[in-house]
């Protein structure tokens, strides 16, 4: 009995506080070590039964250094009106609800993108601000490296760039934009790129920043791969994707050419001026009617 109690206290001393409830509930059996610490979370390797997985512990809002979080939260739907009002007022309850939405956004995005055919870690649930998910491994059974730690040949860079662009397209077709995609948020396993870190993923239709964020995501990835294959830098991939998306012509299987359609027709200045004059005339008429009614 004493030995069991002593063992429990040793486990508690070694285990991060936020992971203790998961151990007590049997969700996690053992914390194996810290994998990395980033701007919005700390990631641990954990044992869950016979499997080794990741436990992503989100940092409190006050400790997170993620810039301009409000831009990412725009358009996120809150079904409960009480929660929505509380979040607008900034009450403690509202802040707690905002935090819960931020933490659940990643697991929701992972499920959605996996169903859309995007290569992301398999999620196993989010428990009190801790996301349990698949640990991505390389062909030798080691933790998969990030893209920025891998040296590529020009051929491999072109191939992997095309793979990532296809995943960006599938994400957009599923209604999401990553919002923080770079060589630091892509892992490389024995199959190829795996996209990670999605708590800031945004609703492409509801967020006014979607186009700018998509362009930044694509630019980041193209610039990185372009170090190894400079010909990629000549492509207009972001504009091509968004152009097709706006037209309703983008599908999960769309193949990019890196070329955009440019309207070379001369501007019809006369028609534009007529529309402006008509608008002014309509406004003057409206003001005249208002004055007559006074």
Which residue ranges define each predicted feature?
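A glycine-rich phosphate-binding loop feature that marks nucleotide/adenosyl-phosphate handling sites
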Residues: 129, 185-188, 237-244
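Regulatory N- and C-terminal appendages and interdomain linkers associated
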Residues: 1-37, 155, 159, 163, ...
């Amino acid at each position: 009995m004493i030995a069991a109690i002593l063992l429990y206290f040793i486990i508690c001393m070694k285990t991060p506080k936020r992971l203790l409830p998961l151990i007590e509930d049997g969700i996690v059996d053992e914390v194996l070590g810290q994998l990395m610490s980033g701007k919005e979370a700390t990631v641990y390797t954990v044992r869950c039964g016979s499997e080794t997985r990741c436990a992503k512990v989100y940092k409190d809002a006050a400790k997170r250094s993620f810039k301009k979080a409000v831009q990412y939260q725009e358009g996120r739907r809150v079904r409960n009106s009480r929660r929505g009002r509380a979040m607008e007022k900034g009450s403690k309850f509202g802040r707690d609800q905002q935090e819960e939405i931020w933490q659940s956004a990643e697991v929701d995005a992972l499920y959605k993108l996996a169903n859309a055919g995007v290569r992301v870690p398999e999620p196993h649930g989010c428990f009190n601000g801790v996301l349990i998910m698949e640990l991505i491994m390389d062909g030798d059974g080691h933790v998969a490296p990030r893209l920025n730690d891998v040296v590529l040949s020009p051929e491999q860079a072109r191939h992997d760039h095309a793979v990532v662009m296809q995943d960006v397209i599938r994400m957009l077709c599923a209604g999401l934009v990553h919002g923080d995609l770079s060589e630091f948020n892509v892992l490389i396993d024995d199959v190829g790129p795996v996209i990670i870190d999605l708590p800031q993923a945004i609703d492409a239709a509801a967020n006014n920043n979607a186009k700018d964020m998509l362009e930044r995501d694509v630019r980041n990835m193209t610039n990185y791969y372009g170090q190894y294959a400079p010909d990629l830098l000549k492509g207009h991939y972001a504009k091509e994707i968004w152009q097709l998306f706006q037209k309703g012509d983008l599908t999960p299987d769309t193949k990019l050419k890196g070329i955009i359609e440019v309207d070379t027709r001369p501007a019809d200045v006369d028609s534009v001026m007529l529309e402006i004059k008509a608008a002014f005339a309509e406004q003057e008429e409206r003001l005249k009617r208002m004055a007559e009614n006074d």
